[in-house]
Amino acid sequence: MILTVTLNPAIDVSYPLDELKCDTVNRVVDVTKTPGGKGLNVCRVLNDFGETVKATGCIGGESGDFIINHLPDSILSRFYKISGDTRTCIAILHEGNQTEILEKGPLLSVNEIDGFTHHFKYLLNDVDVVTLSDSLPAGMPDDYYQKLIGIANLNGKKTVLDCSGNALEAVLKGDSKPTVIKPNLEELSQLLGKEMTKDFDALKEVLQDKLFDGIEWIIVSLGADGVFAKHKDTFYKVDIPKIKIVSAVGSGDSTVAGIASGLANDEDDRALLTKANVLGMLNAQEKTTGHVNMANYDKLYQSIKVKEV
């Protein structure tokens, strides 16, 4: 079983407009509301793929109830209730653009943070892999993912971390290491303080930096150019075919789902990398974020090329 953790989920609201007019009323006919957050995208894709998955995180208020009520019944909902209201994130789609208004989310108390920590420990009993995705809510210290990873490691669970900024830096500088991290080139550049390119030799060199010691897998997204990955002392380049992209939103989360599935099923390197990239591409072919159409899985799987470099 796979446990997905979304500590700061949201209701994602989409407002499509022909034109966004400022300082006046804009009326919307077709409003879409869905449970949002990177970890929730991961769990929906895992569910589409047929994995047994349970979802946790911190939710509160009517918005939190909305999230629970709008997840598929086959996903085991194990969220931790807090006093604050779960946030709302608004995307205004207008004239080929997307303008976003993102709430910060609730402020968690020390007691609520401690309560979730105990809740997390309890949820580990029957899981093999844990995914940790997205930003931390207000009130949680930067090293909180480091704490959860330490707990998972003590219980023999594999972890996939997909975050950035201070939270990622705290994990890399801490004692407890995740099984997998999945930065993109921009995040890698921020971590290392220098501009990173798709040059293989340069990527090989930086992924052997002491900053990444103890991390079994480092999987770097190269966008349409596929993936560059390091597993222990072996490096891989993953080439992907060109596809018609409907929406790339959530494709990174779908890739995380594939990584988690590969770990949970003890798949070899090539199978894990292939599955992860296929699920990412399948999501990009869908209008709905965090969804894959498995009818196209086998065809795409055969088109992925994984080579050792």
Swiss-Prot record:
GO terms for cellular component: cytosol. Keywords: ATP-binding, Kinase, Lactose metabolism, Nucleotide-binding, Transferase. It holds the Pfam family PfkB. GO terms for molecular function: ATP binding; phosphofructokinase activity; tagatose-6-phosphate kinase activity. The keyword Transferase applies. Belongs to the carbohydrate kinase PfkB family. LacC subfamily. This is Tagatose-6-phosphate kinase. It comes from Streptococcus pyogenes serotype M6 (strain ATCC BAA-946 / MGAS10394).
